[in-house]
């Protein structure tokens, strides 16, 4: 029997609370009485503050807030570029951007170790051969690769690195491009990125598959660990590429003065990053990657929601790098941007970034060294773009001019694997997982002075809550230094009154807030309460009632992007549709492709991690409770995973006391890295968090 207003939540915590509520409303004789329920628990709509919006994709106020931040940062970068007056100014800017990029990825390994290359097989093709290669980019980190070598050994050949995009079979997926390059006389190396192809890090040998998909999911798990350690997954992807260059330089067939790179999608990301940081790259052609960060932040939830941390470098926007900065780091070397008009990397962003870099190339006499090609098609390295790219490579490598593309002879995947089992970590007993490497990276640095959480919170703030004006809302949106409160309505059940408020702040944001208090026993003690999904609902009434009976008023509120401010939309991964079949709560917060994960990564790009924005929201709620609701003392608590946030609130704001929860523990970022923990609530992702105490 279900009374009107009960909501059956599919996630476990909500289900537990439903049973708690049922227990509270069940008489000793086992009879369930709906009239009694009405007296005990307020109706569901008493907990709803905002007008519900139709389900579906939308630019929410929080997403718009993130985009506004990114555009302001992009405009600041453009002003810096416009101030460049000489080539010396440009090179100085280039050095600054390079240093920022190195800092964002956590630096590069300090020394190069032995590659220990070995060939595991060879296939003879028409005019070239394909060698199956395994080398070590770091001790115990085995890289599986294919090397395409022209049969003509009478002269040295230019070489091309082809980093793989997000394909399950990694390097093999790009064999057509590699064959075409080899047919033109290039030595080509294509390798599996970590987490793809033969380099799964979470392979279940019995099930003969990874615990995650081999497109982006392993990158998400590893990348989130890397963030906590103070680095980025891109650090190790770039290093694999640099070591691939080292390998090419050991080949007698290779002309070391003519090393080039091209790749598409995730391979385009790697091509841009490797070329930016390795001056040995002569020519670069990144495909289907270069765009504009604000535009990319605005569309990826809807068209490409999969988490890919190596593309979301911490402070990439706020540090003035962005995609144009990666092109700047190529100057004055030749670079071509290959784009798809119908790509989910917005074409207008690609055109914008290209033109900004082009102006600098032109201003200092290098106009012929930068180019762009566009194909009218979706996300792919099309034949027309490949032809333009190969012509560009030929021109700057002194190769004969050719027309058209060679017809590739595609080989089955099984013929192109480098290992016996198909997975290098299965074959190599001495292999190290990247999670181990990330842990080692952290351990080498954990002796450094600890970082205080409060210091991190108070730096890089978009809003100074303590100095903002707290005023009544009069219909005019707030300025950046205002918090405007609006009383929506009040209702009562027995002696309990629930006041619904909206706090307008940060120009665009709204915070739904409930003030729950006992009319007959007014108190000045207040507890802030929330769970991992936001403010309280009717299912949480047994928990709230305990605080009311203990003499507390309750203030419960939604953090930006959670609760009633969630986007009513399930992001569907094109690479793993099963993620879209999760119930709404779990799909929304899924760390591999959920809406919340995309909000979190957007926040990293703009320099203020979502976790700190949640803390900012709690400071706003606390100040409102003190100055408007008359709270003389404030405590905070939360059940389950949300206790981590409650603990952080009490640590940063000493005026707020933490009320402990039975069996509740706060996550420790350092322990997550030490344990190589694969998942945790994505909203608690803090770059460098393992070093925070």
What is each of the regions a protein language model found here?
Residues 243-318, 621-685:
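Primarily recognizes the serine-hydrolase "nucleophile elbow" in alpha/beta-hydrolase
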Residues 313-327, 358:
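Alpha-helical scaffolding within the catalytic cores
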Residues 39-142, 331-512, 516-527, 532-553, ...:
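Alpha/beta-hydrolase-fold serine-hydrolase catalytic core, especially in secreted/extracellular enzymes
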Residues 155-242, 247-250, 293-305, 522-624, ...:
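Cap/lid segment of the alpha/beta-hydrolase catalytic domain
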Residues 1-16:
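N-terminal secretory signal peptides that target proteins for export/translocation
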Residues 19-30:
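Bacterial N-terminal signal peptides
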Residues 148-150, 163, 191, 262-264, ...:
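Generic beta-strand/beta-sheet core signal
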Residues 25, 35-36:
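Cleavable N-terminal signal peptides
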């Amino acid at each position: 029997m279900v009374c009107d207003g009960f909501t059956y939540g599919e996630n476990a915590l909500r289900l537990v609370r439903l049973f708690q509520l049922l227990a509270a409303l069940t008489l000793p004789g086992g009879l369930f009485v709906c009239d009694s329920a009405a007296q005990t628990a307020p109706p569901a709509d008493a907990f709803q503050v905002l007008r519900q919006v139709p389900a579906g994709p939308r630019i929410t106020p929080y997403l718009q807030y993130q985009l506004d931040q990114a555009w302001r940062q992009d405009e600041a970068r453009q002003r810096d570029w416009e101030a460049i007056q000489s080539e010396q100014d440009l090179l100085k800017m280039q050095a600054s951007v390079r240093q920022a990029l190195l800092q964002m990825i956590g630096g590069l390994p300090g020394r190069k170790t032995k590659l220990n290359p070995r060939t595991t097989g060879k296939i003879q093709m028409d005019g070239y051969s394909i060698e199956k290669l395994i080398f070590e980019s770091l001790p115990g980190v085995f890289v599986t690769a294919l090397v395409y070598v022209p049969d003509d050994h009478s002269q040295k050949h230019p070489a091309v690195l082809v980093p793989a995009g997000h394909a399950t079979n990694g390097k093999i997926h790009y064999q057509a491009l590699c064959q075409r390059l080899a047919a033109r006389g290039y030595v080509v190396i294509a390798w599996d990125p970590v987490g793809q192809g033969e380099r799964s890090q979470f392979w279940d040998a019995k099930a003969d598959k990874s615990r995650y998909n081999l497109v982006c999911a392993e990158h998400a798990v590893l990348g989130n660990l890397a963030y906590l350690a103070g680095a980025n997954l891109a650090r190790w992807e770039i290093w694999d590429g640099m070591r691939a260059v080292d390998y090419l330089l050991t080949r007698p067939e290779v002309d070391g003065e003519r090393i080039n790179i091209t790749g598409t999608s995730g391979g385009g990301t790697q091509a841009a990053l490797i070329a930016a940081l390795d001056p040995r790259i002569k020519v670069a052609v990144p495909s289907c990657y270069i765009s504009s960060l604000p535009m990319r932040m605005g569309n990826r939830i809807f068209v490409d929601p999969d988490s890919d941390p190596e593309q979301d470098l911490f402070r990439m926007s706020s540090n003035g790098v962005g995609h144009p900065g990666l092109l700047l780091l190529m100057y004055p070397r030749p670079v071509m941007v290959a784009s798809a008009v119908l790509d989910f990397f917005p074409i207008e962003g690609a055109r914008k970034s290209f033109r900004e870099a082009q102006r600098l190339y032109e201003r200092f006499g290098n106009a012929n060294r930068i180019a762009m090609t566009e194909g009218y098609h979706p996300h792919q390295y099309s034949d027309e773009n490949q032809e333009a790219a190969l012509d560009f490579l030929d021109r700057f490598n002194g190769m004969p001019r050719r027309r058209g593309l060679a017809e590739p002879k595609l080989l089955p995947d099984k013929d192109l694997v480098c290992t016996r089992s198909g997975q290098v970590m299965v074959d190599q007993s001495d292999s190290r997982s990247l999670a181990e490497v990330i842990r080692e990276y952290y351990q080498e640095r954990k002796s450094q002075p600890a970082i205080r959480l409060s210091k991190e919170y108070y730096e890089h703030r978009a809003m100074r809550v303590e100095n903002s004006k707290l005023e009544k809302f009069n219909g005019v949106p707030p300025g950046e230094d205002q918090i405007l409160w609006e009383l929506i309505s009040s209702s009562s059940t027995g002696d309990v009154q629930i006041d619904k408020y909206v706090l307008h702040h940060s120009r665009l944001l709204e915070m739904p807030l409930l003030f729950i208090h006992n009319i007959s026993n007014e108190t000045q003690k207040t507890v802030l309460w929330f769970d991992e999904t936001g403010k309280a609902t009717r299912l949480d009434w047994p928990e709230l009632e305990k605080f009311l009976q203990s003499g507390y008023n309750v203030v419960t509120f939604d953090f930006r992007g959670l609760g009633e401010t969630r986007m009513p939309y399930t992001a569907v991964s094109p690479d793993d549709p099963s993620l879209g079949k999760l119930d709404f709560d779990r799909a929304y917060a899924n760390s591999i492709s959920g809406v919340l994960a995309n909000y979190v990564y957007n926040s990293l790009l703009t320099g203020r991690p979502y976790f700190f924005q949640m803390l900012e929201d709690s400071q706003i709620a606390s100040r409102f409770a003190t100055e408007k609701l008359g709270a003389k003392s404030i405590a905070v608590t939360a059940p389950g995973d949300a206790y981590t946030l409650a603990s952080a609130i009490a640590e940063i704001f000493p005026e707020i006391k933490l009320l402990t929860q039975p069996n509740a523990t706060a996550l420790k970022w350092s322990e997550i890295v030490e344990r190589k923990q694969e998942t945790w609530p994505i909203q608690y992702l803090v770059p460098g968090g393992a070093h925070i105490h």
